[in-house]
UniProtKB/Swiss-Prot annotation:
Motif Ice-binding site motif (T-A/G-X-T/N) 3: chain residues: 263-266
Temperature dependence: Active at low temperatures, even below 0 degree Celsius. Thermal denaturation midpoint (Tm) is 56.4 degrees Celsius.
Protein name: Ice-binding protein
Resulting phenotype, T251Y: Has 11% thermal hysteresis (TH) activity of that of the wild-type
Domain remark text: The ice-binding site is formed by three T-A/G-X-T/N motifs.
Cellular component terms (Gene Ontology): extracellular region
Organism: Flavobacterium frigoris (strain PS1)
Extent of motif Ice-binding site motif (T-A/G-X-T/N) 2: 245-248
Outcome of substituting N203 to A/Q: Increased thermal hysteresis (TH) activity compared to wild-type
Function: Has antifreeze activity for survival in a subzero environment. Binds to the surface of ice crystals and inhibits their growth. Has high thermal hysteresis (TH) activity, which is the ability to lower the freezing point of an aqueous solution below its melting point, and thus the freezing of the cell fluid can be prevented protecting the organism from ice damage. The TH activity of this protein is 2.2 degrees Celsius at 5 uM and 2.5 degrees Celsius at 50 uM.
Length: 276
C-alpha cells in the first residue's frame, strides 16, 4: 500500500520536470527567432551609402529621358559657347535665345550644323530661330523629367564621392555636390538606363575617366545637375549632361555624350561626340 501511495507523487514530479524542459526549449527557440528577426531588421535599415562598389536595381524599370529635338545637338546652350581653338565637335551646335554672336566656335571645329537665332555667328552657321526655340524648350522638358524621377535606387552613394565605384543601372540621387576624383565604371546592358540626379555641382578631376562596360551605352546615361559641371583637364566623360547652369570643360577633356546647359558652355581644345 505504501508503494501505491508514492506513485502519484512520482508522476507529479515527472510531469513538472517535463513541463520545465518544454518551456526551456520554447524559450530558447523564441530567443533564436527574435535574434534572427533583429538581425534582418537591422540589415534592412542600412542606407545605400553602405554599398561600397555597386548595387542592384529596386525593381523599377527606368524609361529613357526624352530629349526631343535637343537630341540632335552635341552642344546646346541658352547664353553662349566660348572656345579655345581647336576643339573637335561631332553633332549639331546651337545657342538660344542669345544672339549667334555668342557662339565663338570656328566652322572647322564642327562636324555638323551650327544653328543661330539671327544673322550673327560663325560664317557657316544656319539661322533657324524656330528650331532652336523648340530644341531649348525640349532641353528644359528633359531636365525637368530627369529631376522629377522619384524613389531613387541609391541615395547619396559614397557620401557624394564616387571614385573607384562601378555603377549599375538605376536611379541615383545626391542631395549636394558630386565629386569624381578617380576613375569609375558604368556597367550594364545596351538597353539599361542610368539617371543621376545631383542637387549641387558635379566635379570631375583631371585625367579621370568614365569607362563603359557590359554593353552600356552613353546615349542611355543622363546626368541632371542643378549646379555647374566641371570636367578636369584630359578627363573623359560618358553620357548626356543636363545642367541647370553652366558646363566647363578644361583643356583637352573629352565627352562621349551631349552637353545641354541652361547658361553657358566653355570649351578649351575639347572633343565632344554625340553618342550613337
Amino acid at each position: 500500500m505504501k508503494i501505491l501511495k508514492r506513485i502519484p507523487v512520482l508522476a507529479v514530479l515527472l510531469v513538472g520536470l517535463m513541463t520545465n524542459c518544454s518551456n526551456d526549449s520554447d524559450s530558447s527557440s523564441l530567443s533564436v527567432a527574435n535574434s534572427t528577426y533583429e538581425t534582418t531588421a537591422l540589415n534592412s535599415q542600412k542606407s545605400s551609402t553602405d554599398q561600397p562598389n555597386s548595387g542592384s536595381k529596386s525593381g523599377q524599370t527606368l524609361d529613357l529621358v526624352n530629349l526631343g529635338v535637343a537630341a540632335n545637338f552635341a552642344i546646346l546652350s541658352k547664353t553662349g559657347i566660348t572656345d579655345v581653338y581647336k576643339s573637335a565637335i561631332t553633332g549639331d551646335v546651337g545657342a538660344s535665345p542669345i544672339t549667334g554672336a555668342a557662339i565663338l566656335l570656328k566652322c572647322d571645329e564642327v562636324t555638323g550644323t551650327i544653328f543661330s537665332v539671327d544673322a550673327a555667328g560663325p560664317a557657316c552657321k544656319i539661322t533657324d530661330a524656330s528650331r532652336l526655340t523648340t530644341a531649348v524648350g525640349d532641353m528644359q522638358i528633359a531636365y525637368d523629367n530627369a529631376a522629377g524621377r522619384l524613389n531613387p535606387d541609391f541615395l547619396n552613394l559614397g557620401a557624394g564621392t564616387i571614385g573607384g565605384k562601378t555603377l549599375t543601372p538605376g536611379l541615383y540621387k545626391w542631395t549636394s555636390t558630386l565629386n569624381i576624383p578617380t576613375d569609375i565604371t558604368i556597367s550594364g546592358s545596351s538597353t539599361d538606363v542610368w539617371i543621376f540626379q545631383v542637387a549641387g555641382n558635379l566635379n570631375m578631376s583631371s585625367a579621370v575617366r568614365i569607362t563603359l562596360a557590359g554593353g552600356a551605352q552613353a546615349k542611355n546615361i543622363f546626368w541632371q545637375t542643378a549646379g555647374a559641371v566641371t570636367l578636369g583637364s584630359t578627363s573623359h566623360f560618358e553620357g548626356n549632361i543636363l545642367s541647370q547652369t553652366g558646363i566647363n570643360m578644361k583643356t583637352a577633356a573629352s565627352i562621349n555624350g551631349r552637353m545641354m546647359a541652361q547658361t553657358a558652355v566653355t570649351l578649351q581644345m575639347n572633343t565632344v561626340t554625340i553618342p550613337q
